[in-house]
Amino acid sequence: MRSTELVQWFRQSTPYVNMHRGKTFVIMLDGDTIASENFINIISDIRLLHSLGIKLIIVFGARFQINDLLMKNHIRPVYHKNIRVTDLRTLELVKQAAGQLNYDIMSRLSMRLPHSPLLNVVSSNFILAQPIGVDDGVDYMLSGKLRRIEVENIKQQLENDAIVLIGPVAPSVTGESFNLPFEEVATQVAIKLKAEKLIGFSNTQGILDKDGVSIPDLLPQQAANYLQQFIERDQYHSSQARFLQAAIDVCRAGVHRSHLLSYEEDGSLLQELFTRDGVGTQLSMESSEDIRIATARDIPSLLELIHPLEQQGILVKRSREQLEMDIEKYTIIDRDGVIIACAALNVYEDEKMAEMACVAVHPDYRSSSRGDVLLAEIRKRAKNLDIEKLFVLTTRTVHWFQERGFHMANVEDLPKDKRDHYNYQRRSKILIQNLTEPSE
């Protein structure tokens, strides 16, 4: 990377650094990821995330290493309903594999680099297990499920600037040890800790479509369809399938976003988190929500949504007739038939510019990521129209747009028609984002 590109990357990443600081991320590291040649670089990137003020919980699995030990000991893995059946001998090998990985991960995270502080990595009894029991006549023996998560203990460690490390073996209240599916642990930890993100890795750059191209965004129902395809191909144990199941569950429980990245590509974690378009697959939003182009039937709901903001002077007043004429310009988020957010895209073809206008989010959802979802969709629509610059006029949300890569501009920077009709009495701030800039 040339020095100018490096400077540009740092500048573009700044909004994301600010956005992620203080948030809690749960990172899933399965056995394949840990065994990959690129794992040492992933560890370095995790250390970087911690240095940027992100609270990190690492949940690791050991399926690859466990199966390797079983094979070396001439023991055939046994599964029932995609869950490993763990007898006493198998549990000893599970503990051996998990214990070694726990030590290796902790050692690599704790490795001190020149002029950098020593990281505090904590691995303790943060979870308690209980036996799965018998299902359809099959005794799972020492395979377990979560009984309790020590949420306050984990929070305290995060507040003390520690990285929390959790493995797939946990004790029970009776003193026995149980083998847990690590994706179940990661799922429940993310939900109970109210994490901002769940991050996983696989041998592909996210979920691929039928042409082998990475899918940038998925809704839960779309993710469920892809998960079913993995199951039908008898690939439930793949990294992709296990991540999809976890991501669907956490998204429906309130975790804002989940990301699946390649463990083979160096820097994929940083590219996903600190560039505009990312590199892997992101799953977000609840299944009850739909983002779509507005229709005439949506006009009453749109008026109801934007009217309070017009009364406050935040939005310019729009008549019903004007909405009817421009309805196809509006992108809306529909939640169970209720419009909870909207934004319009006004295109100026000659200048290859477009305006994101009439941005409104229902008060009950303003603390969520709906604004980000709208912005991403408007960007996508603009790019599909070969728009090079996206601009906004705002009186109240300058910082919000600046945090997402927009830069202050002047009236002279607007398209001619918009410039000629600029309301100097309203004194709206003008912000512009270049859609043609590289994302790294």
Curated annotation (Swiss-Prot):
Keywords for this protein: Acyltransferase, Amino-acid biosynthesis, Arginine biosynthesis, Cytoplasm, Transferase
Subcellular location as annotated: Cytoplasm
Gene3D superfamilies recorded: 3.40.630.30, Acetylglutamate kinase-like (3.40.1160.10)
Catalytic activity as recorded in UniProt: L-glutamate + acetyl-CoA = N-acetyl-L-glutamate + CoA + H(+)
Pfam families in UniProt: AA_kinase, Acetyltransf_1
Note: In bacteria which possess the bifunctional enzyme ornithine acetyltransferase/N-acetylglutamate synthase (ArgJ), ArgA fulfills an anaplerotic role.
GO terms under biological process: L-arginine biosynthetic process
PANTHER family: AMINO-ACID ACETYLTRANSFERASE (PTHR30602), AMINO-ACID ACETYLTRANSFERASE NAGS1, CHLOROPLASTIC-RELATED (PTHR30602:SF12)
Taxonomic placement: Bacteria, Pseudomonadati, Pseudomonadota, Gammaproteobacteria, Pasteurellales
Predominant cellular place of this UniProt entry's protein: cytoplasm
Record GO cellular component, one term: cytoplasm
Listed name of the protein: Amino-acid acetyltransferase
